[in-house]
Structures are given as structure tokens and as C-alpha cells.
Amino acid sequence: MSQEKKVFKTEWAGRSLTIEIGQLAKQANGAVLVRYGDTVVLSTAVASKEPRDGDFFPLTVNYEEKMYAAGKIPGGFKKREGRPGDEATLTARLIDRPIRPLFPKGYRHDVQIMNTVLSADPDCSPEMAAMIGSSMALSVSDIPFQGPIAGVNVGYVDGKYVINPTVEEKEVSRLDLEVAGHKDAVNMVEAGASEITEKEMLEAIFFGHDEIKRLVAFQEEVVAHIQPVKKEFVPVERDEALVSRVKTLTEEKGLKETVLTFDKQQRDENLDTLKAEIATEFVDEADPENELLIDEVYAILNDLVKEEVRRLIADEKIRPDGRKPDEIRPLESEVGLLPRAHGSGLFTRGQTQALSVLTLGALGDYQLIDGLGPEQEKRFMHHYNFPNFSVGETGPVRAPGRREIGHGALGERALKYIIPDTTEFPYTVRIVSEVLESNGSSSQASICGSTLALMDAGVPIKAPVAGIAMGLVTREDSYTILTDIQGMEDALGDMDFKVAGTKEGITAIQMDIKIDGLTREVIEEALEQARQGRLAIMDHMLQTIDQPRKELSAYAPKVEIMHIKPEKIRDVIGPGGKKINEIIDETGVKLDIEQDGTIFIGAIDQDMINRAREIIEDITREAEVGQVYNAKVKRIEKYGAFVELFAGKDALLHISQISKERINKVEDVLSIGDSIDVKITEIDKQGRVNASHKALDENK
């Protein structure tokens, strides 16, 4: 990299975009500082000097949000940033996906991309700035990279598409779409939406791509000015004679028939056996001290299996489990499996199975999101777990990884739109999807299982949601789109395109590809084929349960809503929260109070709610002129008695208003603790209440 600072500027969605190179992080292979509005992101790219053994590309993308970027001090005892939160992890995955396909095939050097948010402007997306920064850091480095790429956020506000919508625009947008690609094609899509049609989604994707092409052209100008010298990478060539011999052996031993074993586990066993048998043919030729030849044979075998799977799909239109390209695996579904859970749904598609379990909580059980933006309260959560046994393996049990966080978030996006608001359903909702068996598309099975669990729990959802994953196999002059891909098709195909939605439209999509990009024609066809598959799955699910149950589980908490005047909130809370804590301690309820005076009372027992409501009504109750109360004498003075009309509200009963007869001393007729009927005669401007017993006698 050049050591001299260079600055390049352009305009992006009405705001200034600046790329600075040559001043910071000069020991990295590539480093850029991206300024977008008041957002500042440092992006660096570093590659190891030597390649790693193995047949995978060791790329790591990190995205770090420094709290000082938003003028905040981290919470917790240590007061410093910890491990990345879920949102940062999702952003790292978002950047990884469009970049990964653009490294040379066979490249095995460790590559680490670090994105550090140094300043955060809520209206200038740090995520999109980091994506451009990652692309630029790679492009101006000596690391082989077939970019640049760019990404944009697309909203849909008042019937118009918007690039990088502001915070206010996002609140009313029907679409939250992130799309990335290079100048020729789109290679990453992620979106949440409120029943967007396939046509609207397609237009949004390519509306975003038009802006991407402009940003890529800007980056190409920067690269042309910097003129980086790329390290030469020469992929390892296969020994053609060895490839030919191994291929002949696979044909003799029936590779096609082995691939077309319909059961996943049996197919895997048969393939392992076939590979082992062929490898033994070369054992005598291998140096006892060197296993490189055997490793090469296995690598060739893996390539040949991939080639055969793709050939069968592209040429013979038959898939490893015998299905046609647009055929869905057998479906099974069930609800109400767990008697003590508030809702449960089991969804099985072929050899993929997800159990989704729903829990209802009070509004106060929300998750607090404290990131670079304002604090947010999340009252709908979807979590996804993928245990080792789901694929017949053993291994350590760890905290959720990037994949589990990503799949959980995708399901959350797909279902968020159908969750009713608090005025209709005053609960916090958490769904956990346990993948019990997996052969591809487990994230979409979790969406289907979650919809079943929502209806089983009696949540009044706006509409059921189903999800499906689409695949792709490309040839030089043709392509085949696959409906409901299984594990082998995901691993050996060119695309994993997940689409979830209702009968009316899309609520979430996610597209990952292993090729350079997709044309408009392919995306349009995949969306339509996904729509047909989604509707077929929906029809099956509705045969199991066609609408939400009328009543909640007997074990679910009960929540009731009451309203008080906003100025009465302080009375319910009390000094330092004393009064509200007394109510909670006495009744055992959970209380959530909104600024408009709405109070949500939650408890497992109706009597607890009723008691809490009575206490709050007493606290917030107001005396009315002309109203008669049976009051209790609390204090006696020379000039009269103070009587309690109801909890928290006293009135003055003047000595002249006690009786029609003249009274010399209040104590002659009243004692502390006595009950007496009084009528409210006046409430002055300070809220002081005057009462009369004499007025009742006069009315007789």
C-alpha cells in the first residue's frame, strides 16, 4: 500500500462518501477509512503468508461496534466492550457473503477482514459503510480479489423505493432490504418485509443494483489511482492421469447409483464405502511416510461426486433423493406436543425436522437492545438451536455460533410482521426452534414450526407464514432451479435462496451464492418457483391447524390492560418506586406502565390481577363533587375532622358541616376510626376536598 494519504469523494444517497487510504493501519495488507455522513468505519484486510492445509477457504469477517462511536460508556461491571452482540455478528455475516465468492478458486490463505465503527450516525448506516470498506480494503491490497463489490439498504416508503432510508423512513417502510453485488450481477440479498409481492421485491433488488453499479465504478476509479500490485496466485492443478484413473474406477463401482441413494444416511455411508474402496487401489503406490497421494485421491473423488450430482440435476433432471427439480419432500406437522409449554409445533420435511416451542411473558420480559443507536425493547424473539445429534454427530456443546444466530434472526424477520401489537396482544413472545433432524433447509422448517406454535398458543397472528429454500445448478448455457433443497444440493449447488411469507406476499428472504452473481431472469424465476412451493407448504400446515386457538394455555400468564390519567402515573409509582413495589410485593403481579397511562398487569392467577387492579383504582381514583362516600375518620382537629374517602384520598369535614345542631367539640360526636357518610361539596384549585355530613341530613 502507498504510505501517502489519499482522499476520494463521491455522493451516496444524498450524503457525502469519502474513502481515505494511506494514513491508518499501514501494516495491514489493505486499510481504508470510510466516512459516510458522520459515520466513520476503519476497514482492514490481512492475509497469511502461507496457505492452510485443507479444502476450504479460511475467511473471517469481523464487525466491531465501539460504544464511544455513539458517545456511550458500555454497561456492566468492566465498562468495556465484550464479545460482539447478535447485531454485530449478523452484520459480519452480511459482509462475508458477497465477498466470499470473489476470491480465486483454490485460494487457501487465511484472510481476516476487520471493520471497526469509530463514529456512528444513525441515518448513515455503519453496516453498509463497512461493506464498502471491506471491499475497498481488499481491492487496494495485494490480496487476490475479484471485486470490488458494494451494498445498499433499500426501503419502500409511500410506494417509492429509497436508498439507505433514514431512521424515520425505516419506521414507516414496508421493506428493509440489504442487497450487494458487483457491476455485472447481484450476489447477496437479505430482507424483511410486510407482505411484499414477488414483483415488488424483484424491482427493489435491481433498484438497489443500479446504485451498486455506481458505487463499484467509484471504487474502480480509486483502485486505478492506487494501482495495487496483487500477489500471484497459481491454483494447484490436478494430475490429469490420476483424475482419469479415479474417474474410471468411480464409473466401474457405480457412482451414479451411489449418489441416487434416496436416504441421506445410507447415501453418506455408501459414498464413504465407495471412496474407501477406490482409495485402497492406491495404497501400495503411496509412500508409507506420505499420505499426500491418498489425500489427492479423496479430493478428486469429492470433485467427481459434485460433478455427478450436478450432471444428474442439469441433464437428467433428477435429484439425489429421486425428486424432480420443483418437487417438495414429504411433509408432516403436529401441534400441542408439550402440555406445559404455552404453544408447540413440530414440522418435518423429509429428513429435516424442527420443534418450535413458544413461551408467553409479560411486556416487562422484553429484551433490551443497547447498541450504537437508541435503546430498543424487543418483545418478539426467535432463537434457533442446532445440536450435534440432528446430523448424527458428536461434539462439544457450545454457546450459539454465527450460523445459529443468523438462522434465528432470519426466522425472527420472517415472523415479526405477523405478531400483533401490544394493544391487541399485550405479551412478550419468545419462540425457540430446536432442530431435531437436519438434511437442509432447517431454518425454513423452524419458520414453519414457529407458525404452528403461534397458532397452537392462541396468538392472534395476522396470517400464517411458511418458508422454503431454493437451490440452483448452473451450466455454461443453462441453469436448473431447485425447490426445497436438501443438504447435498446446498453443499454442491450454486445457491441457497430462502424465501418466507404469507399467502399474500414475502416477509423475509436471504440469498447466498457460490458463483459470481445472478441475473434478473434467474432471481425472478426463483421467486416465482418459491411462491408456488410456499403456498403448497402453507396448505399442508393449515390442514393441521387452520387458525389460532381461541384461548391461551392454562399455564400461560394472564395480562390485562387498564388506563389511568398520565398525571396519575407518579401516584402509582410513588417516591423512588415505593408504591409500585408495594403493589408487586403484595399481589405478585408484573406491572408495566406506558407514558400515556396504559398499565399492563400480568400474573399467573386472575385473583392476583384483580387485587392489583383494585389497588391501582384506589390510588388513582378521584373524588367528585356531589358524590357520597362512606368515609373513615383519620385525624381530628379543633376546626373539624379529616376523613379518608378511599385509599390515598382525604377530605376535610369542617366542624360546621358535621351536624345541623351546633357542636362545641368534634370529639363530642366523632372518634378516630369512626365511619361516616359524607357528600363532596367542593374541590378547590389545589385539589383540596371539602365534605359535608350535614348536607345529607338536609336532603332527607
Swiss-Prot record:
<feature type="domain" description="KH">
    <location>
        <begin position="557"/>
        <end position="616"/>
    </location>
</feature>
<keyword id="KW-0460">Magnesium</keyword>
<keyword id="KW-0808">Transferase</keyword>
<keyword id="KW-0548">Nucleotidyltransferase</keyword>
<dbReference type="Pfam" id="PF03726">
    <property type="entry name" value="PNPase"/>
</dbReference>
<feature type="binding site">
    <location>
        <position position="490"/>
    </location>
    <ligand>
        <name>Mg(2+)</name>
    </ligand>
</feature>
<keyword id="KW-0963">Cytoplasm</keyword>
<keyword id="KW-0479">Metal-binding</keyword>
<protein>
    <recommendedName>
        <fullName>Polyribonucleotide nucleotidyltransferase</fullName>
        <ecNumber>2.7.7.8</ecNumber>
    </recommendedName>
</protein>
<dbReference type="Pfam" id="PF01138">
    <property type="entry name" value="RNase_PH"/>
</dbReference>
<dbReference type="GO" id="GO:0004654">
    <property type="term" value="F:polyribonucleotide nucleotidyltransferase activity"/>
</dbReference>
<dbReference type="GO" id="GO:0000175">
    <property type="term" value="F:3'-5'-RNA exonuclease activity"/>
</dbReference>
<dbReference type="InterPro" id="IPR036612">
    <property type="entry name" value="KH_dom_type_1_sf"/>
</dbReference>
<dbReference type="GO" id="GO:0005829">
    <property type="term" value="C:cytosol"/>
</dbReference>
<dbReference type="InterPro" id="IPR012340">
    <property type="entry name" value="NA-bd_OB-fold"/>
</dbReference>
<dbReference type="GO" id="GO:0000287">
    <property type="term" value="F:magnesium ion binding"/>
</dbReference>
<dbReference type="InterPro" id="IPR001247">
    <property type="entry name" value="ExoRNase_PH_dom1"/>
</dbReference>
<dbReference type="Pfam" id="PF00013">
    <property type="entry name" value="KH_1"/>
</dbReference>
<dbReference type="InterPro" id="IPR003029">
    <property type="entry name" value="S1_domain"/>
</dbReference>
<feature type="domain" description="S1 motif">
    <location>
        <begin position="626"/>
        <end position="694"/>
    </location>
</feature>
<keyword id="KW-0694">RNA-binding</keyword>
<comment type="similarity">
    <text>Belongs to the polyribonucleotide nucleotidyltransferase family.</text>
</comment>
<dbReference type="InterPro" id="IPR020568">
    <property type="entry name" value="Ribosomal_Su5_D2-typ_SF"/>
</dbReference>
<dbReference type="GO" id="GO:0003723">
    <property type="term" value="F:RNA binding"/>
</dbReference>
<dbReference type="Pfam" id="PF00575">
    <property type="entry name" value="S1"/>
</dbReference>
<dbReference type="GO" id="GO:0006396">
    <property type="term" value="P:RNA processing"/>
</dbReference>
<dbReference type="InterPro" id="IPR004088">
    <property type="entry name" value="KH_dom_type_1"/>
</dbReference>
<dbReference type="Pfam" id="PF03725">
    <property type="entry name" value="RNase_PH_C"/>
</dbReference>
<dbReference type="GO" id="GO:0006402">
    <property type="term" value="P:mRNA catabolic process"/>
</dbReference>
<dbReference type="InterPro" id="IPR015847">
    <property type="entry name" value="ExoRNase_PH_dom2"/>
</dbReference>
<dbReference type="InterPro" id="IPR027408">
    <property type="entry name" value="PNPase/RNase_PH_dom_sf"/>
</dbReference>
<dbReference type="InterPro" id="IPR015848">
    <property type="entry name" value="PNPase_PH_RNA-bd_bac/org-type"/>
</dbReference>
<comment type="function">
    <text>Involved in mRNA degradation. Catalyzes the phosphorolysis of single-stranded polyribonucleotides processively in the 3'- to 5'-direction.</text>
</comment>
<feature type="binding site">
    <location>
        <position position="496"/>
    </location>
    <ligand>
        <name>Mg(2+)</name>
    </ligand>
</feature>
<dbReference type="InterPro" id="IPR036345">
    <property type="entry name" value="ExoRNase_PH_dom2_sf"/>
</dbReference>
<dbReference type="InterPro" id="IPR012162">
    <property type="entry name" value="PNPase"/>
</dbReference>
<dbReference type="InterPro" id="IPR004087">
    <property type="entry name" value="KH_dom"/>
</dbReference>
<dbReference type="InterPro" id="IPR036456">
    <property type="entry name" value="PNPase_PH_RNA-bd_sf"/>
</dbReference>
